[in-house]
Amino acid sequence: MRVFLSAYGNFYLAIPITYISSIMLYSGNSDKKIEHNSENHNTYISLPILFDYTGETPRHGIILRNNMNDENNGIIKNKTILLTTEIEHEINIPEERIYSMPKILDKIKISRVFSGILFEPDRQDKNMFLFLNPEVLIQNLQKELE
C-alpha cells in the first residue's frame, strides 16, 4: 500500500494514496476542526486539531478524490481537503505487515477513523504508523455536524 506519511508527536499518520487526488502547500491558519468555504464549497478538516496536536501547524493540504473514478480531480471545487503537518515521506508498505486496529480501541471514538496499525520497533523516532481511512473520517464528521 502506497501512503503519504505525516508526523504527529510520536507516530506517523499514513494516508493511502488511493484516496488522494492531489497535494497542495498550505500556508493558512486553521483554528477550527472543520471549515467550509462557501465560495468554492470545499471542506477543510484540520487533522492537527482533530488529533489534539494544536501546537502543530498544517503545512500541506491533501485533496481527496470525490470518488474512486473522479474525472474532475484537477478542479478544486466541492472537495474535502485534509490539512496535515508536513508530508515527510511517500512509501510503500506491504499490506500483510499492517494489522487491524485492536478491538479494545473501539471504545475510543477517534480510533474508528483508522483502518490499521503498524509498529516498527527498529525506528528510533516514530515507531507507530496509524493508517487513516478518510471515508470513515468524513462519515463521522458529517454525523457530528448534523
Residue ranges and their predicted role:
Residues 1-146:
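An acidic, low-aromatic, low-complexity terminal/linker signal
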